[in-house]
């Protein structure tokens, strides 16, 4: 009997999620076959190494940076796809010739929107780690997807999807979204004025890329996840509780109408949700070590300090507004986060910028009928955010 593997296309192959996904594929050749990779171009040597390890041809590789693409192409003996839309172009090319069964979108930021939409149009399952593309695209993106086509990779949303298997849609009472609290849990806003980019890059329980780590420190990441949960599970923002769980063992919970709460627990590793998303709805044996319940464990939960970390409440308000308002939240944060990393503004000012841009967002945000509406809203939000950052940086 011939074994049929799931063909996987990975976008963002050199990042934290992408490299772990490749490890899962390499460890499970009986389950997965890699049919292409895309990367930004900051690490062309790693792209070359990945392509060679999986015997990829140049046409199966995309690199956004032109110079890096040239280096990769020369090493692989051909021309690779390049340019700012390289990932989207790769999706369209692969899906037209040797279609992937699932596309893992692990790109960073809303630049992943085009690739998300291209994947949905192709009919492939979308294993989504690029939460920003869903937040920015909102209801427009969800309208392009058939039921069950988007499989979350975020550990929290993967946990929700797993817990939801325990009941029916009408039985769900509340969703509980857990947060580690980040490196500054327990700090006051005043204390955080002196935070450096190096401090913000040190997450207590997770190993992630720079932007995700910073977003976790401000709790913007948890705000994005709250918005994402309302879209993925078609639920109201007020039915989602956010609780701080520093141990990062419980990845999220579902409370049902009979008073039962189902939780998903596992050590803090992304390999389990990555493997599950690529092989959904089936689990991958040995994806990661399980918890050892013969040892003592202490799990704690506490409320979010909204005074010190207002990003979650901002996101809740944005989720209720819907339309392109979530795109404003994300775009303003991307600009403010970059400004902080460049030393132009202080740590608490990241969320201050997001909040102020949202206050005037009704002038340019609203219902999105197409991608152009989303991109126009993002562009205006970025412009306004940078104007504000310029004033703050003086």
UniProtKB/Swiss-Prot annotation:
It is an enzyme of class 1 (oxidoreductase). NADPH binds at residues 14-17, 40, 43, 130, 132, 209. Keywords: Isoprene biosynthesis, Manganese, Metal-binding, NADP, Oxidoreductase. InterPro entries: DXP_reductoisomerase (IPR003821), DXP_reductoisomerase_C (IPR013644), DXP_reductoisomerase_N (IPR013512), DXPR_C (IPR026877), DXPR_C_sf (IPR036169), NAD(P)-bd_dom_sf (IPR036291). Its cofactor is Mg(2+); Mn(2+). It catalyses: 2-C-methyl-D-erythritol 4-phosphate + NADP(+) = 1-deoxy-D-xylulose 5-phosphate + NADPH + H(+). GO terms for molecular function: 1-deoxy-D-xylulose-5-phosphate reductoisomerase activity; manganese ion binding; NADPH binding. Mn(2+) binds at residues 154, 156, 225. Pathway: Isoprenoid biosynthesis; isopentenyl diphosphate biosynthesis via DXP pathway; isopentenyl diphosphate from 1-deoxy-D-xylulose 5-phosphate: step 1/6. 1-deoxy-D-xylulose 5-phosphate binds at residues 131, 155-156, 180, 203, 216, 221-222, 225. GO terms for biological process: isopentenyl diphosphate biosynthetic process, methylerythritol 4-phosphate pathway involved in terpenoid biosynthetic process. It holds the Pfam family DXP_reductoisom. Its EC number is 1.1.1.267. PANTHER family: 1-DEOXY-D-XYLULOSE 5-PHOSPHATE REDUCTOISOMERASE, 1-DEOXY-D-XYLULOSE 5-PHOSPHATE REDUCTOISOMERASE, CHLOROPLASTIC. Belongs to the DXR family. Catalyzes the NADPH-dependent rearrangement and reduction of 1-deoxy-D-xylulose-5-phosphate (DXP) to 2-C-methyl-D-erythritol 4-phosphate (MEP). This is 1-deoxy-D-xylulose 5-phosphate reductoisomerase. It comes from Corynebacterium efficiens (strain DSM 44549 / YS-314 / AJ 12310 / JCM 11189 / NBRC 100395).
């Amino acid at each position: 009997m011939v074994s049929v593997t799931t063909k996987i296309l990975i976008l963002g192959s050199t990042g934290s999620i992408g490299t772990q996904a490749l490890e899962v594929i390499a460890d499970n050749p009986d389950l997965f076959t890699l049919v292409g990779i895309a990367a930004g171009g900051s690490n062309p040597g790693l792209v070359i190494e990945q392509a060679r390890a999986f015997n990829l041809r140049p046409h199966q590789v995309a690199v956004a940076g032109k110079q890096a693409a040239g280096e990769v192409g020369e090493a692989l003996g051909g021309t690779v796809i390049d340019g700012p839309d390289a990932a989207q172009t790769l999706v369209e090319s692969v899906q037209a010739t040797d279609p992937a069964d699932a596309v893992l979108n692990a790109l960073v930021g809303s630049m992943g929107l085009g690739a998300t939409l291209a994947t949905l149009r192709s009919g492939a399952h979308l294993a989504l780690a690029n939460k920003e593309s869903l937040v920015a695209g909102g209801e427009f993106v969800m309208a392009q997807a058939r039921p069950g086509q988007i499989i979350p990779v975020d550990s929290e949303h993967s946990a929700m999807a797993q817990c939801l298997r325990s009941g029916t849609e009408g039985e769900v009472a509340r969703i509980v979204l857990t947060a580690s609290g980040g490196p500054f849990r327990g700090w006051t806003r005043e204390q955080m004025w002196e935070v450096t980019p190096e401090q913000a890059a040190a997450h207590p329980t997770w190993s992630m890329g720079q932007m995700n780590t910073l977003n976790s420190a401000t709790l913007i990441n948890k705000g994005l996840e709250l918005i994402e949960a309302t879209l993925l599970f078609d639920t109201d923002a007020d039915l989602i509780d956010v609780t701080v769980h520093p141990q990062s063992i419980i990845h999220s919970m579902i409370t049902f109408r009979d008073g039962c709460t189902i939780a998903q627990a596992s050590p803090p590793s992304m390999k389990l949700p990555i493997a599950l998303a690529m092989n959904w709805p089936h689990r991958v044996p040995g994806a990661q070590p399980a918890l050892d319940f013969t040892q003592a464990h202490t799990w704690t939960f506490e409320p979010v300090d909204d005074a010190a970390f207002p990003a979650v409440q901002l996101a809740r308000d944005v989720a209720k507004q819907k339309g392109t308002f979530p795109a404003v939240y994300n775009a303003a944060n991307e600009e403010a986060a970059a400004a902080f990393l460049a030393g132009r503004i202080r740590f608490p000012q990241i969320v201050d910028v997001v909040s102020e841009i949202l206050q005037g967002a009704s002038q340019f945000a609203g219902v999105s009928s197409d991608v152009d509406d989303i991109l126009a809203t993002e562009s205006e939000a970025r412009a306004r955010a940078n104007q504000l950052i310029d004033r703050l940086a003086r």
